[in-house]
Amino acid sequence: MTGAWIRAQGRQLGPIVLAGPILAGGAVALLGWFAADAWPPSQAMTLVTWLAQVFVIATGVCAAVALTGDPLLELHESTPTGFRRVQLTRAGLVTVSGLSGAAVMFFPLHAVRAWPHDQGWSTVASPTGAVVIVVVAALLTAAFAGTASTTTIAVVAAWMFLAMLWDPYVLPLPQQRGIPLIVSAGLLVAVWHRLGDAERNIAKVVTV
């Protein structure tokens, strides 16, 4: 995978999709920093908790747009690049942006002790793991459904699962992020095989 190929896919996605997670992470860090300076620690952490969820949703939406926003995406199957290569490259670009945004968000808030349930530098695994999970959810849904609306719904569902059903009750970080990431790795295998099915990829173009 050449640098020219990656740059070409980056241009297709556009600066908003590529920079969206980083900008969201920076905004959360800035607001959290101000809150930590002006409010009691408990109130600042509560605000950061909710703002961090906005960052995860923003990253997931960027992934959904990246993976479904091109109406001619499946036509790459008729070229030497292949549909799977295109989708995995685009998912990878959003993931890198999301991981960067998570770092931009976490480390300043960790420095001012405004990050909730902070267990040290390793706590960065919480937002970075969430990024990977929602991107995999977007990639999986885009691979099998292919529509922007369904993919966005899947991203929101993955976020709701983490924010409301998983993270509040599974506090040890290795289990909190390790188990969903193991499941995500298994789902990536299914995505790999589905995106490699040239007949289904071409059939999607024919039926559109």
Where are these regions (language model features)?
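Hydrophobic alpha-helical transmembrane segments
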Residues: 1-49, 140-144, 156-208
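Secretory targeting signals
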Residues: 24-64, 89-161
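Perimembrane helix-loop junctions in membrane proteins
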Residues: 69, 113-114, 147, 198-201
